[in-house]
């Protein structure tokens, strides 16, 4: 794979699709800044003191216009930054170009192969002879995974000379990861351990990545502290819900131009993401059906007037299928073969294994007809009918559209900045062990408060006697940690 790092005139490393798109990217970044009051408030509050001076931050998170504002907030606070995308289709090339030219090292472009994707992830983590990053901003956990797998392989190699064998797994993507680590062993057999020793911690953006972190914590294999940004209320109850409510129909319409009204739509999963997707489809006039494993979530859907059925009950009746579960094997090839002609199948969970894309690709005689980028018709030979698969089973709102809008991402990314500041500030105190943490309630409330003025809100103030009556401080936090918003 002949990929070469390029350098700007100032000497900054990068690999993007087209650096000449930087001016266009800069114009959209300036528009987004107006819609991201939380991040701009962070610049105003912390910029003068440069709290990240001397810090190296590596980010693996969708390289969009909104992420560009996050990156430039980190650099405005003094950090050096290297960045890659966490999805092969989610990069906005003009955003990547603007950041590469003006602010940070970027390795990302829309339409990467899996080999290119992991090459970009490796470049993002490499800071030269001094080791790796001090901090990681992760989305889905791939940067964290690469370091953990690299350390594991180096230790086995030092102990018994064992070299990772890509043929030891059937997972095509993990074969690439093992090959990457195998090649690094021959050049620098201590690279990932140096990264581990330098790392202060990671802040994780999304549900899937958080699951990975907790799995490592419970198994005792987590190598550094982690802050779970996803479960901040101002992330999961806003980005996951309202962001998806906005970006799901945007992706559907850009990809297919289909009229949603009157269609039967199946939403697999009714967590925060599923709730937002179902609300969007219902508002657009679709007849929405939910599938669920959790009786509480199922009851919530029923209270919203949404039938809860099994996929097998409705697979031949529905027009649109959306997976939102964060689990695997939700829609299988046998389901797809029973669907209506031109039924739309898409995923808004982080990885591509909610839909059985491997089984679809390998099904005998199936024909792939590309309508346009990230919109493919798959025709089955025995029925001569087909389905429309969006973004190859990956995140359709970023593959087929531009993802969540700036305002809701400001809330999520303000949490990221606060988490990174907290990890860096406490790096020598021992406050954070090799465990997963969440941000305290008063910081969650602060993130929300930073976004109220933009929408013209005016908060009512508690009197001291009112605060005493309900046993909360006048300035908050107003809810206990266990409160369910």
From Swiss-Prot:
Q: Which residues bind substrate?
A: 64, 139, 205, 235, 239
Q: Which residues form a coiled coil?
A: none
Q: Tell me which InterPro entries the record gives.
A: Adenosylhomocyst_ase-like_sf, Adenosylhomocysteinase-like, Ado_hCys_hydrolase_NAD-bd, NAD(P)-bd_dom_sf, S-Ado-L-homoCys_hydrolase_CS
Catalytic activity, reaction form:
S-adenosyl-L-homocysteine + H2O = L-homocysteine + adenosine
User: What does the sequence similarity comment in the record state about its family?
Assistant: Belongs to the adenosylhomocysteinase family.
**Assigned EC number:** 3.13.2.1
**What cellular component GO annotations does this protein have?**
cytosol
Q: Which gene encodes it?
A: SAHH
Q: Which cofactor does it need?
A: NAD(+)
- The protein's name is Adenosylhomocysteinase
PROSITE patterns from the entry? Answer: ADOHCYASE_1 (PS00738), ADOHCYASE_2 (PS00739)
Q: How is the cofactor bound?
A: Binds 1 NAD(+) per subunit.
Q: Which NCBIfam families match?
A: ahcY, PRK05476.2-3
Q: What does this protein do?
A: Adenosylhomocysteine is a competitive inhibitor of S-adenosyl-L-methionine-dependent methyl transferase reactions; therefore adenosylhomocysteinase may play a key role in the control of methylations via regulation of the intracellular concentration of adenosylhomocysteine.
Q: Does the keyword Hydrolase apply?
A: yes
Source species taxonomy: Eukaryota, Viridiplantae, Streptophyta, Embryophyta, Tracheophyta
Q: What induces it?
A: By infection with B.cinerea.
**What is the species listed in this Swiss-Prot or TrEMBL entry?**
Phalaenopsis sp. (Moth orchid)
């Amino acid at each position: 794979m002949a990929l070469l790092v390029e350098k700007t005139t100032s000497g900054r490393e990068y690999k993007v699709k087209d650096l000449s798109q930087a001016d266009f990217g800069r114009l959209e970044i300036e528009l987004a800044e107006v819609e991201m009051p939380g991040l701009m408030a962070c610049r105003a509050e912390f910029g003068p003191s440069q709290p990240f001076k001397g810090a190296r931050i590596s980010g693996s998170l969708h390289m969009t216009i909104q992420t560009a504002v996050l990156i430039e907030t980190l650099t405005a606070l003094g950090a050096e930054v290297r960045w890659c995308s966490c999805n092969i289709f989610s990069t906005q090339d003009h955003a990547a170009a603007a950041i590469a030219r003006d602010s940070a090292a970027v390795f990302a472009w829309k339409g990467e192969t899996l080999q290119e994707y992991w090459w970009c992830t490796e470049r993002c983590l490499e800071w030269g002879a001094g080791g790796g990053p001090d901090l990681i901003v992760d989305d889905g956990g791939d940067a964290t995974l690469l370091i953990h797998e690299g350390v594991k392989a180096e230790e086995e190699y030092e102990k018994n000379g064992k070299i990772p064998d890509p043929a030891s797994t059937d997972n095509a993507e993990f074969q690439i990861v093992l090959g990457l680590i195998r090649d690094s062993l021959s050049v620098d057999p201590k690279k990932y351990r140096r990264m581990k020793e330098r790392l202060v911690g990671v802040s994780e953006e999304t549900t899937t990545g958080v699951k990975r972190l907790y799995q490592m914590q419970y198994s005792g294999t987590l190598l550094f502290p982690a802050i779970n940004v996803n479960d901040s209320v101002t992330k999961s109850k806003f980005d996951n819900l309202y962001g998806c409510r906005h970006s799901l129909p945007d992706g559907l319409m850009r990809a297919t131009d289909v009229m949603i009204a009157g269609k039967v739509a199946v939403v697999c999963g009714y967590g925060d993401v599923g709730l937002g997707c179902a609300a969007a489809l219902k508002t657009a006039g679709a007849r929405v059906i939910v599938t669920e494993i959790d009786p509480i979530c199922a009851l919530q859907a029923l209270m919203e007037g949404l039938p809860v059925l099994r996929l097998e009950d409705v697979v031949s009746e529905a027009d649109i299928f959306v997976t939102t579960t964060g689990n695997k094997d939700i829609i299988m090839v046998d389901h797809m073969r029973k669907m209506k002609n031109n039924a739309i199948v898409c995923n808004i969970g982080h990885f591509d294994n909610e839909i059985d894309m491997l089984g679809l690709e390998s099904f005998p005689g199936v024909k792939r007809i590309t309508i346009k980028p990230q919109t493919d018709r798959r025709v089955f030979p025995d029925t001569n009918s087909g389905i429309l698969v969006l973004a190859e089973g990956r995140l359709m709102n970023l593959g087929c559209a531009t993802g969540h809008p700036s305002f809701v991402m400001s809330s999520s990314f303000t949490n990221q900045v606060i988490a990174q500041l907290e990890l860096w500030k406490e790096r020598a105190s021992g406050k954070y062990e090799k465990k997963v943490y969440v941000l305290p309630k008063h910081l969650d409330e602060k993130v929300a408060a930073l976004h109220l003025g933009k929408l013209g809100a005016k908060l009512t103030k508690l009197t001291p006697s009112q605060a005493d009556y309900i046993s909360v401080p006048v300035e908050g936090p107003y809810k206990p940690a266990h409160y369910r918003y």
